[in-house]
């Protein structure tokens, strides 16, 4: 009997290998030949699933975004505690999330000058902002306009913290990232509420 190959699963497998290589070596230095060698497939097979490296990067980016969303959805707790844990799920606190951030940064470097990638990045950013807005509104009972403004400040802070941590991990370990996030949350929610309701997740 012929072997049935799951086309989408094979594409995901190749994209995950590409993500590992991009995280370690950078987008410009990674070649389709190198990706093929790392997967154990020929370049012909890889080219069958992806027409070029751009298409590979797009899927690697989407898979990283999906993993981040699963981490956010796994956050438990109520109010500010859930908000804090959800936002922490975006930060590069461990090896897996640092890898995802390396892929995102590679994608952003292309998105800055590429219309298709730029549109994808704007769509993802707006989805993340809307999610943060709903979490802020749920945590603080804020009106829509206030929740949107707070979510924008929070997401801006998260991007800044994350990029510092990716570029200088020795100075930005997980604890410092969490502390910086807590300081930002304290500007959004009443300080005593942040301390009381977020304390449970930091013990």
Where do the language-model regions lie?
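Helix-turn-helix
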Residues: 13, 17-55, 59
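Solvent-exposed, amphipathic alpha-helical segments
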Residues: 17-24, 70-71, 103, 107, ...
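Hydrophobic alpha-helical connector segments
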Residues: 59, 70-101, 150-154
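Short, basic, alpha-helical segments at the C-terminal edge of helix-turn-helix-like DNA-binding modules
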Residues: 62-67
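Amphipathic alpha-helical segments used for helix-helix packing
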Residues: 95-118
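A surface-exposed regulatory interaction patch that couples sensing to output
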Residues: 95-99, 134-142
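Hydrophobic/aromatic-rich alpha-helical bundle segments in the mid-to-C-terminal region
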Residues: 117-122, 126, 139-203
């Amino acid at each position: 009997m012929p072997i049935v190959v799951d086309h989408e699963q094979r594409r995901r497998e190749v994209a995950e290998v590409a993500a590992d290589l991009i995280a370690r070596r950078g987008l410009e230095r990674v070649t389709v030949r190198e990706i093929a060698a790392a997967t154990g497939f020929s370049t012909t097979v890889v080219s069958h699933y992806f027409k070029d490296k751009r298409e590979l990067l797009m899927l690697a980016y989407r898979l990283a975004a999906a993993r981040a969303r699963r981490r956010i959805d796994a956050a438990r707790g109520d109010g500010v505690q859930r908000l804090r844990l959800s936002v922490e799920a975006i930060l590069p606190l461990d090896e897996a999330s640092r890898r995802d951030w390396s892929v995102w940064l590679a994608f952003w470097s292309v998105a800055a000058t590429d219309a298709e990638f730029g549109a994808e990045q704007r769509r993802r950013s707006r989805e993340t902002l809307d999610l943060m807005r709903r979490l802020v509104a749920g945590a603080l009972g804020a009106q829509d306009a206030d929740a949107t403004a707070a979510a924008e400040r929070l997401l801006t802070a998260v991007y800044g913290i994350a990029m510092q941590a990716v570029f200088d991990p020795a100075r930005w370990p997980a604890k410092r990232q969490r502390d910086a996030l807590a300081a930002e949350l304290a500007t959004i929610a009443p300080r005593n509420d942040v301390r009381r309701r977020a304390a449970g997740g930091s013990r």
